[in-house]
Amino acid sequence: LVAGTAAADLLAERLGIDLPDDRDYATAAGLALATLKRLPEEGESFALQGWRFEVVDMDGRRIDKLLVSPAG
């Protein structure tokens, strides 16, 4: 379980994923928004570089928690 406010760089390092150098986000929530290109609803998920990210909690229009697990 990852907080939306978690640093994207640290998350990428721990998961072994590559983030674009020219990205305009710094958090896990920003990564989700950049990937989905819209505000998600609770329960939505996406896959990225072998990992599944599920939005498990929204606080209004803010992504509060993401569940990250191996895609498969």
Name each model feature, range by range:
Residues 1-72:
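Cytosolic regulatory modules rich in charged/polar residues
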